[in-house]
């Protein structure tokens, strides 16, 4: 029982009000807070200070609670991941599919292989691919169109980030018709333009600035810089190095420049221009529609039906055996008639000296679709496909650099160096690609891709699951400390140290009365109050006392507004007989009386 004089204050004004508890007042406005750190975060609203920043989306926050909520929800992952995904190119997908099917088929050892063979085979393959694209179905026998559409001028822009200026060229085109296969003379250009149409004979020049005038008639032509001139021996050395490694390091560039006695920048620009030329020559869309129709019309005369890749190779073999001599003669004739004038970065040329010739001759160089270029094509266009296969769990995609460090012996290679197969011995560097299970996964992955946008979105959802926030501790000067075992971030080092007990399972603070142990010291302090009966926290309205600060805070924040104050009650007859004292009880029977 509680005496009235001890339980009730002398006057009602002595009870601390809510305004008295909010002793931390904002100097800018009339708001007041119970805790100092609430005032600090409120002042940031006036000052505009936002000390917390997300490392993923770089969004800043003024309140630690908003920052913690943002980091826990990981909303910024979905916004950052689409930029990491390269969309599919339908032409590249079809090329990749056909290459994989060719690798899956048995090797035909009786088929000859020369520099011109790959060119002829790729022209047939391109014609078949374009025909399937127009029909919207799988590769089928090609038919001669009634009226081939005239190709439109098209400018292909090669984006080379390291090239400081633009390289331009003039391309001469001429159409020649042979008995077996009509071929078109198009010299792959290290330039910013292409010839508009195969029907236009003569010199057609389109530079990057949109001018179509001939360079010889312009009064602004000046001689090339002396550093841009390379003799035949220097170009031969550069071509040999390019065959071995089209992407040399800066140390290899310096070594090559020292070997041929030129500046490193000259070698670097030569490699960049040559790579651009290779990309342009290997790009399917760069083939004019007119040449596609011509190739398709010529292929229609062949009795072979192009239903499968094996039949396509048979058609190529038949064509080569019938027209090898005429094709070789026509290629030599076109090489003599074509003229490539490669200009310096300033767009200058000199009639007295021979400018830098970046064209690859067919005598001492490999064909356009050589094994090295095919490997580069697979590496450049198959990155997204490799990611799909890697996520599928097969793990059969190999690294080209790792394979190059382990040369394959001649007896271990599936195709010997002296074999006449159309697929050379470089296939041995990718033995696991020939796995039927892997190819089935590749086919399934390719069939699921309907458009480049769908590819990007599907890969985005898969890669977002793999992304994780940095688990390394942040710098102390940033004021944030992250746990190295989870995604939580703390503003103090001591808070991080206490949090690590959650992962380690240690309970260093033990009670000396019972056997309980706690991870944090303040938990032990509050636990000891259960043994001692101490309740230092009391509600000033209902006079209820609490031993734990958390219970007291919850009561003050949620129940203080409607908890019933204590009032006098008439004493029961037994109380009057015993002592005659008047008791105080809460107005609500649900609220327990205050404990002392």
UniProtKB/Swiss-Prot annotation:
Residues 133-145, 188-200 have a biased composition (Polar residues). Disruption phenotype: Worms exhibit a starved appearance, are unable to swallow food and die at the L1 larval stage. RNAi-mediated knockdown causes significant reduction in expression of mec-17. Residues 201-216, 578-590 have a biased composition (Low complexity). Keywords: Developmental protein, DNA-binding, Homeobox, Metal-binding, Nucleus, Repeat, Repressor, Transcription, Transcription regulation, Zinc, Zinc-finger. It is found in: Nucleus. One of its GO terms (biological process) is larval development. A zinc finger (C2H2-type) spans 24-46, 52-72, 481-503, 509-531, 537-560. Residues 133-225, 324-369, 395-421, 569-596 are annotated as: Disordered. Expressed in the six touch receptor neurons (TRNs) but not in the FLP and PVD neurons. Expressed in the M4 cholinergic motor neuron. The keyword Nucleus applies. GO terms for cellular component: nucleus. Its main location: nucleus. Residues 223-282 bind DNA. One of its GO terms (molecular function) is DNA-binding transcription factor activity, RNA polymerase II-specific. Residues 165-179, 331-355 have a biased composition (Basic and acidic residues). Transcription factor. Down-regulates expression of genes involved in either the synthesis or reuptake of serotonin, dopamine and GABA. Acts as a transcriptional repressor to regulate multiple, discrete, neuron-specific aspects of terminal differentiation, including cell migration, axonal development and gene expression. Promotes touch receptor neuron differentiation by repressing the expression of egl-44 and egl-46. This is Zinc finger E-box-binding homeobox protein zag-1. It comes from Caenorhabditis elegans. The lineage of its organism: Eukaryota, Metazoa, Ecdysozoa, Nematoda, Chromadorea.
